Amino acid sequence: MHALDALDALSIKADIPDFSPGDTVRVYVNITEGDRSRVQVFQGVVIARRGFGVRQTFTVRKISFQVGVERIFPLHSPSINRIEVVTKGSVRRAKLYYIRKLRGKKAKVKQKREL
């Protein structure tokens, strides 16, 4: 198992910002189509984080043309170019799955106040 731990340590990214469920993030993902490569931006609310170490993932939800879209990203994936935290949210839960049922202004996450 020590060899696997060493391999995991090499794959962990160091430039990941501190974010939690309720925060609005902008994820820049490298998309390769044939011989061309481009960067796609996915911005939404983090509704869950799970896993530990290299296997850690986070789920981002956004509304696109009145349809909810969720995407699960591996945190240490090489296809993720960078992650930006747009706003910090104030929530009392670790998993925000209840937001899936809410519509309109009720689906908003309250912004955390700066002290």
UniProtKB/Swiss-Prot annotation:
List the NCBIfam families hit by this protein, alphabetically.
Answer: rplS_bact
Q: Which HAMAP family match?
A: Ribosomal_bL19 (MF_00402)
Q: Does the keyword GTP-binding apply?
A: no
Q: Which GO terms describe its biological process?
A: translation
Alphabetized SUPFAM superfamilies for the sequence: Translation proteins SH3-like domain
One term under GO cellular component: cytosolic large ribosomal subunit
Per the similarity annotation, which family is this? Belongs to the bacterial ribosomal protein bL19 family.
As for what it does, the entry says:
This protein is located at the 30S-50S ribosomal subunit interface and may play a role in the structure and function of the aminoacyl-tRNA binding site.
Q: What name goes with this protein?
A: Large ribosomal subunit protein bL19
Keyword Ribosomal protein on this protein? yes
What Pfam families does this protein map onto? Answer: Ribosomal_L19
Keywords, in A-Z order: Ribonucleoprotein, Ribosomal protein
Organism lineage: Bacteria, Bacillati, Actinomycetota, Actinomycetes, Micrococcales
Q: A GO molecular function for this record? A: structural constituent of ribosome
| Listed Gene3D superfamilies | 2.30.30.790
